[in-house]
């Protein structure tokens, strides 16, 4: 099977995270031939590919062209990382041209800017793996499942469940640390709470979340505007 990794506008962390699979990369290479991945190879091709991993937001005209090319060439497209699935931090920008002007003045942008949007706003996506960055073990298992003809299953539970399964102390109730775990999609194995930190919501909203209830709980700890800021950082709740 042929695998392509396509990067749009982002910090580069999601593509780099794939390389941090280390020895497991060798396991993947038993199933996949890397057709395109600029962090790992200078090879580029126009051939059809079986699986495309797309990271980043669509923020420029070039991004949109790369995304459409990846979709047209691939049988199975995965939006990888919260930029691709929800828009993430840069998705907060509602007017990219105005944001550019505030930083750089009235000069002409070097590229055609678009308001940052997730991959899912532009093309059909076969599977989505959120996270900033995503859990590399999750993407490894998804790729192995696809190679074996098994349809991957999205996580449909909140981070809170993973805290319970790992028997972590609840940082929200026990330590009064702001935590979005009750309303954030699981799949990270409760990484932040495992270090005694509150979940920052980087995987976006969970199914059947109760954001109004979460807001009321957090009001006992934070002012309203700070709660709203936390909820808007990675996804549009």
From Swiss-Prot:
Optimum pH is 8 for hydrogenase activity at >95 degrees Celsius. Its cofactor is Ni(2+); [4Fe-4S] cluster; [3Fe-4S] cluster. [4Fe-4S] cluster 2 binds at residues 160, 163, 170, 179. [4Fe-4S] cluster 1 binds at residues 11, 14, 83, 132. Belongs to the [NiFe]/[NiFeSe] hydrogenase small subunit family. Optimum temperature is greater than 90 degrees Celsius. Activity increases with increasing temperature from 30 degrees Celsius to 90 degrees Celsius. Has a half-life of 6 hours at 95 degrees Celsius. NCBIfam families: sulfhyd_ShyD. Gene3D superfamilies: NADH:ubiquinone oxidoreductase-like, 20kDa subunit. InterPro entries: Hydrogenase_assoc-protein (IPR051349), Hydrogenase_Small_Subunit-like (IPR053638), NADH_UbQ_OxRdtase-like_20kDa (IPR006137), NiFe_Hase_small_N_sf (IPR037024). Its EC number is 1.12.1.5. GO terms for cellular component: cytoplasm. Its main location: cytoplasm. Part of a bifunctional enzyme complex that functions as a hydrogen-evolving hydrogenase with sulfur-reducing activity. May play a role in hydrogen cycling during fermentative growth. Activity exhibited with NAD in addition to NADPH. The alpha and delta subunits form the hydrogenase component that catalyzes the reduction of protons to evolve hydrogen. This is Sulfhydrogenase 2 subunit delta. Dimer of heterotetramer of alpha, beta, gamma and delta subunits. The nickel-containing alpha and delta subunits constitute the hydrogenase activity. The beta and gamma subunits (flavin-containing dimer) constitute the sulfur reductase activity. It is an enzyme of class 1 (oxidoreductase). Keywords: 3Fe-4S, 4Fe-4S, Cytoplasm, Iron, Iron-sulfur, Metal-binding, NAD, NADP, Nickel, Oxidoreductase. The gene is shyD. Binds 1 nickel ion per subunit. It is found in: Cytoplasm. One of its GO terms (molecular function) is 4 iron, 4 sulfur cluster binding. [3Fe-4S] cluster binds at residues 188, 192, 199, 202. It catalyses: H2 + NADP(+) = NADPH + H(+); H2 + NAD(+) = NADH + H(+). It comes from Pyrococcus furiosus (strain ATCC 43587 / DSM 3638 / JCM 8422 / Vc1).
């Amino acid at each position: 099977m042929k695998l392509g990794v396509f990067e749009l506008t982002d910090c580069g962390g999601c593509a780099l995270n794939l390389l941090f699979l280390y020895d497991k990369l060798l396991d993947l290479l038993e199933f996949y031939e890397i057709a395109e991945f600029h962090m790992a190879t200078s090879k580029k091709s126009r051939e059809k590919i079986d699986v495309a991993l797309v990271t980043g937001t669509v923020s420029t005209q070039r991004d949109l062209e790369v995304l459409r090319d990846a979709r047209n060439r691939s049988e199975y497209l995965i939006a990888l990382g919260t930029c691709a699935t929800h828009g993430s931090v840069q998705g907060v920008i509602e007017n990219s041209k105005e944001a550019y002007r505030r930083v750089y003045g009235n000069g002409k942008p070097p590229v055609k800017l678009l308001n940052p949007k997730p991959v899912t706003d532009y093309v059909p996506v076969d599977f989505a793996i959120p996270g900033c960055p995503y859990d590399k073990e999750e993407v490894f298992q998804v790729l192995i499942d696809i190679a074996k003809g098994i349809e991957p299953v999205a996580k449909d539970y909140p981070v809170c469940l993973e805290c319970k399964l790992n028997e972590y102390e609840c940082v929200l109730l026990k330590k009064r640390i702001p935590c979005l775990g009750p309303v954030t999609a699981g799949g990270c194995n409760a990484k932040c709470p495992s270090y005694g930190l509150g979940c920052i919501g980087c995987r976006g909203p969970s199914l059947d979340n109760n954001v109004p209830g979460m807001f009321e709980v957090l009001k006992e700890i934070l002012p309203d505007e700070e709660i709203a800021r936390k909820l808007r950082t990675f996804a549009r709740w």
